[in-house]
Amino acid sequence: MKISILGAGDFGTALGSILAERGCDIDYYDAAFERERLSDVLSKAKFIVLCVPSKSVPHLLPYIPKNIPLIIATKGLLTDDCFKDFEDYMVLSGPGFAVDIKARKKVYLTATDQRVIDLFTLPTLQFDYTNDRRGVLMCGSLKNVYAILAGMKGLQRMTPEWYDFVHQANKEIGKLLMNNSADSNTADLECGIGDLKLTCGMPSRNYEYGTILANRAGFEPENTVEGLTAARRIKRGEINIPEGLPLLTEVLSQLN
């Protein structure tokens, strides 16, 4: 079975290594691969796995066939609105660093379709399940915003202050999901609380960016910081914000 992976970065190749181990024929497409034509990579694919940076998704979607099942592994998407024209899409997300997946360390993720679980499950890679595609995508984006604030506050893992922060941030994410036609319970899955715990500390790029901001207000990173992109989209009104979210209010006030 051929599976096309769009995005040959660390996470895309980590997922590809699992699929190859399970006997799938993998074909990658990446903007850096000038020799590859997207149409050739997608030809005869039974599934497409989307692993490109979130900012690239709107530019790529018009060229992806709408009738091939699409597995969204990109994080940083605030809603699933851009996928409304696709006949069959599902989401894979959660607290998994690519290096840990490649090393076959124990990793737990969230899937929104049994086919994702069937394709990717290994003894070292396990899943919980929800059919809340929008909620899973939102969790994968919002946790990056809160990780920036954790870095700005200098919170250290496993301290009482860190636990309090993660608990409050997760409650706020649940409220945001409920206010945007998603399931608040999704925040309690691996894609929610699990990924939040992983991201609110080093070596998370979002957390690291927050530590820099604490000393250099307005600092603009050279590399993509998904939490900063998401925060700017939130400030533009791309999702509904209920009242009573002090942590989100604080971090948005600190970001340009």
Describe the function of each predicted region.
Residues 4, 26, 137, 178-256:
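NAD(P)-dependent Rossmann-like dehydrogenase/reductase catalytic/cofactor-binding core
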Residues 72, 88-93, 127-131, 188, ...:
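General beta-strand structural signal in soluble alpha/beta enzymes
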Residues 1-47:
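NAD(P)+-binding Rossmann beta1-loop-alpha1 motif at the extreme N-terminus of oxidoreductases
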Residues 12-15, 42-106, 116:
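Rossmann-like NAD(P)(H) cofactor-binding subdomain of soluble oxidoreductases
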